[in-house]
UniProtKB/Swiss-Prot annotation:
One Pfam family linked to the record: Ycf54
Organism: Synechocystis sp. (strain ATCC 27184 / PCC 6803 / Kazusa)
InterPro entries the record matches: Ycf54, Ycf54-like_sf
PANTHER family: PTHR35319, YCF54
Family recorded in the similarity comment: Belongs to the ycf54 family.
Name of the protein in its database record: Ycf54-like protein
Length: 133
């Protein structure tokens, strides 16, 4: 006799689906960011390893992923972020999160980052994770 077992999809797939649903239902949220040059964040500071470790930790705790890495973030083109864009390096990368504490931790760990926040989705920022790259 065959046995049928329910399988649970990996937490990463569930988190991506939940985030997709939130984005498609115009769920307004506050996003926090830490912005740095690509050279600093991707080459000089091995931050990708930190993000991998954090993702693993979230997965073990069945916690929804609330942070993303965005190269050349489009949100900087919003009029309300003109000042941040003026201060941003030409080739930049952002760590974006809905968790303010995580961005504060990033700022403390890295120091040389610009931080801020924005509301999305909005007319100026329809997709908070869009990249110009």
């Amino acid at each position: 006799m065959e046995s049928w077992a329910l399988t649970t999809p990996p937490i990463d797939i569930v988190n991506q689906y939940l985030f997709f649903i939130k984005r498609k239902t115009n769920y307004m949220a506050t996003y926090y960011y830490a912005l740095a040059s690509q050279k600093f964040l991707l080459e000089e500071e091995p931050f990708e390893e930190v993000l991998k470790e954090r993702r693993r930790d979230y997965g073990e705790k069945n916690k929804e992923i609330d942070f993303w890495q965005v190269i050349q973030p489009a949100f900087l083109n919003a009029p309300e972020l003109a000042e941040a864009k003026a201060k941003a390096p030409e080739k930049n990368v952002a760590i974006v999160s809905t968790n303010k504490s995580f961005i504060v931790w990033v700022k403390l760990r890295l120091e040389y980052v610009l931080t801020g926040e924005f509301e999305a989705p909005s007319d100026a920022i329809p997709d908070p994770l869009a990249s110009l790259d």
